[in-house]
Amino acid sequence: MDRRTLIGGIAGAGAVLAGGPLFARDAIASDDVALTVGTRETRLFRTRPAKPRGVALFSTGHGSWPEKYALLTRHLAEQGWVVLSPLHVDSMRHPDRATFTMQASFGERMADMGAAAAVAAKDYPGLPVIAVGHSFGTLTSLCLGGALSYIAPFRAPAVKAVLGFSTPGKIPGLIQPSAYTSLAVPAMIVTGTADTVPGFVKNPADHLFVGQTAGKSAYTIVAKDGGHELVADGAAMARLAPAVDLFLAAYGRGDAKAAAQLKDWTAPDGDRFVVKAA
């Protein structure tokens, strides 16, 4: 199904993210296409600027779906990133969801992202690649950056940086003390003081674990009163997007000026910005 549509911008507070887009909003297209992953097939959702400057491999939260993240994906596209987001088997909108356990879905997620990375290499050769995720998708993206090496070599060599909105927390048996020490690329985690997940994260401070233990440079933004769905909060995203954009420009595209500006960035009143050097 090809649903190519023109995007007319982001309503409300989301429309002012990061002080304005690099590309006109009416030059951004959204559609979804078939994606073959091993012996099965899923959908690959694409949000594309007219003149791509890089590719963002995006992994959704557990049970979620790509279209739910329009605020973020459109903003990334406005900054020049083609966003490629597979519909994972654990999504409530995936037709075969019932046939996969949560444990099995993790491996399938990694396979999805590998297939998306192959599309990026084929369709956008030579462009820089980043990994972006929300919640369980943040873990997926961190794995593309080299995390959880004690389970398998998940590292995708093309990925230059990882951006995550919230994390799935310290999942017993999966997230060990060394989970993120094998990260081979810089990471930024955006979380909040109210970022809890029933049954998984009781203490919002658990989301700081990536920044505290990452093997490379790590940046953590903690938004005052931000919850687990912070990624869909237009007002909060507008407030924090300048740092996000600087991080992606600095480490995704190798912009030295952006790196210097990120170093000097100050969080708005009530928020926190924590930097861990490599």
Map each language-model feature to its residues.
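Serine-hydrolase catalytic machinery in alpha/beta-hydrolase-like enzymes
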Residues: D32-R48, P52-G126
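Alpha/beta-hydrolase superfamily serine-hydrolase fold, recognizing
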Residues: R48-K51, L127, Q176-I189, T193, ...
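Glycine-rich His-Gly loop
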Residues: F58-H62, S135, G192
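The feature captures the conserved acid-bearing segment of alpha/beta-hydrolase catalytic domains
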Residues: A156-V222
